[in-house]
Amino acid sequence: MAELNRFKIEWQCRRGMRELDKMIMPFYQQYFEQLSEAEQRTFVTMLSYTDPELFRWVMHQSPAPTVAISALIERIRASIEA
């Protein structure tokens, strides 16, 4: 991803829901660079969804809209449990 987008991505990681803040920002800071380009695009796409949607996916209350987002959510969950 273009270096110019890093600030925007980091800003979008800051969520209105504190629980999501505690999950998404640390994942971004620790693992984003290690993701493939496709996974990075999926991460950015995931950030465009609302906090309630993201929270439901992370808490397994409803399925994510794509397999790629589901896989990324599971990586975020695994990073929390590690």
From Swiss-Prot:
The keyword Cytoplasm applies. InterPro entries: SDH (IPR005631), SDH_sf (IPR036714), SdhE_FAD_assembly_factor (IPR050531). Keywords: Chaperone, Cytoplasm. SUPFAM superfamilies: YgfY-like (SSF109910). Its main location: cytoplasm. It comes from the Bacteria. One of its GO terms (cellular component) is cytoplasm. Pfam families: Sdh5. It is found in: Cytoplasm. GO terms for biological process: succinate metabolic process. Belongs to the SdhE FAD assembly factor family. An FAD assembly protein, which accelerates covalent attachment of the cofactor into other proteins. Plays an essential role in the assembly of succinate dehydrogenase (SDH, respiratory complex II), an enzyme complex that is a component of both the tricarboxylic acid cycle and the electron transport chain, and which couples the oxidation of succinate to fumarate with the reduction of ubiquinone (coenzyme Q) to ubiquinol. Required for flavinylation (covalent attachment of FAD) of the flavoprotein subunit SdhA of SDH and other flavinylated proteins as well. This is FAD assembly factor SdhE. It comes from Haemophilus ducreyi (strain 35000HP / ATCC 700724). The lineage of its organism: Bacteria, Pseudomonadati, Pseudomonadota, Gammaproteobacteria, Pasteurellales.
